[in-house]
Structure formats: structure tokens, C-alpha cells
Amino acid sequence: MSEIFFPSQEEVLLIHTEIINETGGSHGLRDAGALESALKAAENRLFYETSDLAILGATYAFHLSQAHAFVDGNKRIAAVVSELFLELNNAKLKATNEQIIELFLDIAASRLSREDVERKFAEWLITEKENNE
């Protein structure tokens, strides 16, 4: 198994600031513990369950959306961090912007379970190897 790279909490905080500056909304971390827990969820799943990038990326998407760790921009940070995680690990999602937006709205509205999100990520995931074929 290749080494799997994870975004740091510091990177996520910087990304959140950039997102809010670019797209609007309120700055601020509402719950540092919720952020830490959401970020650690993917690392814990790697350690205890799986190295599947779709599952780990979906874990970021689901837990960051549900954690509401920030005052504003929770869906946006969840989308960016889950895609950043995949990019760090030479993968990406082959989904349209509309599909991504719908997915994160559904996660935030609790219309999808973590397993539902994992299935979507598995359906859309392209690894570097697949991308070069």
C-alpha cells in the first residue's frame, strides 16, 4: 500500500479563511473539537478499517459537513477538503459541479448516510492510473 496523505488541521483552517474571503460568509471556528474529530475520522478509518480512497474521501465529506465546526462555509470546506485529500493521493472525482453541489446539500440536510456518500465517491473516483489509460 502506498503512503496516504492527509490535510492538516492548519491547512484546513487556512483553506476555510480563503473560501470565506472568496465566496463570502462569516469567519470563525465554532467548535474546534468537532473539527478535530471530523478530520481524524478518515485517519482512524485508515488505521482500523480500510485504505480505500473513495471511502476515506467520503469520510471527510460526510463528517466535515455534519460537524458544523465553522460559523459558516461547512459544506464548502467539506467539498474542498475531501477533493484535496483525493488530489494529495493522486485521485479525483469525475462528477459535475452540479452533482457535487447536490451531494453536499443532501449530506448537510441528512438525506444521505455515510455509506450513501461512500457509494457516490466509489462511483465517481478516478485514480492517477485510471486517468492515464
Please describe what each predicted stretch is.
Residues 1-133:
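FIC/Doc superfamily catalytic core
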